[in-house]
Amino acid sequence: MVYISNGQVLDSRNQSPWRVSFLTDFFWGIAEFVVFFFKTLLQQDVKKRRGYGSSSDSRYDDGRGPPGNPPRRMGRISHLRGPSPPPMAGGUGR
């Protein structure tokens, strides 16, 4: 890419892609990515502390917690069954 610096037209192809400033910027970019990645893994409540939580998060602030699971039904639900599957193919080959 061509650019102008101090009144001179310069071409970026003349610069090495492995110059020191590029390598240090690349290193710090990778380091920041790793730090932020592990911060998000270890701090799951970061949304609540920064005010991004939804209003539904405040429903259980009285200490009761969310309601438990509904009671388990005994037996099978037969009225929602569809047609029975077709018989298995194969046989004894005679």
UniProtKB/Swiss-Prot annotation:
InterPro entries: Se_SelK/SelG. Induction: By increased dietary selenium. Expression is significantly decreased by a low selenium diet. Residues 46-94 are annotated as: Disordered. Keywords: Calcium, Calcium transport, Cell membrane, Endoplasmic reticulum, Ion transport, Membrane, Selenocysteine, Transmembrane, Transmembrane helix, Transport, Ubl conjugation. High expression in spleen and intestine (at protein level). Expressed in a range of immune cells including T and B-cells and also in myeloid cells including macrophages, neutrophils and dendritic cells (at protein level). The keyword Nuclease does not apply. GO terms for molecular function: identical protein binding. It is a single-pass membrane protein. The chain crosses the membrane at residues 20-42. Cleaved by CAPN2/m-calpain in resting macrophages but not in activated macrophages. Macrophage activation up-regulates expression of the calpain inhibitor CAST/calpastatin, resulting in inhibition of CAPN2 activity. Truncated SELENOK proteins produced by failed UGA/Sec decoding are ubiquitinated by the CRL2(KLHDC2) complex, which recognizes the diglycine (Gly-Gly) at the C-terminus of truncated SELENOK proteins. Disruption phenotype: Normal growth, fertility and immune system development. Reduced receptor-mediated Ca(2+) flux in T-cells, neutrophils and macrophages. Reduced T-cell proliferation and reduced T-cell and neutrophil migration. Decreased viral clearance and increased mortality following infection with West Nile virus. Bone marrow-derived macrophages from knockout mice display decreased uptake of acetylated or oxidized low-density lipoprotein, reduced foam cell formation and decreased palmitoylation and cell surface expression of CD36. GO terms for cellular component: endoplasmic reticulum membrane; plasma membrane. It is found in: Endoplasmic reticulum membrane; Cell membrane. The record marks R81, G82 as: Cleavage. It holds the Pfam family SelK_SelG. One of its GO terms (biological process) is calcium ion transport. Its main location: endoplasmic reticulum. Belongs to the selenoprotein K family. Required for Ca(2+) flux in immune cells and plays a role in T-cell proliferation and in T-cell and neutrophil migration. Involved in endoplasmic reticulum-associated degradation (ERAD) of soluble glycosylated proteins. Required for palmitoylation and cell surface expression of CD36 and involved in macrophage uptake of low-density lipoprotein and in foam cell formation. Together with ZDHHC6, required for palmitoylation of ITPR1 in immune cells, leading to regulate ITPR1 stability and function. Plays a role in protection of cells from ER stress-induced apoptosis. Interacts with DERL1, DERL2, DERL3 and SELENOS. The SELENOK-SELENOS complex interacts with VCP. Interacts with ZDHHC6. This is Selenoprotein K. It comes from Mus musculus (Mouse). The gene is Selenok.
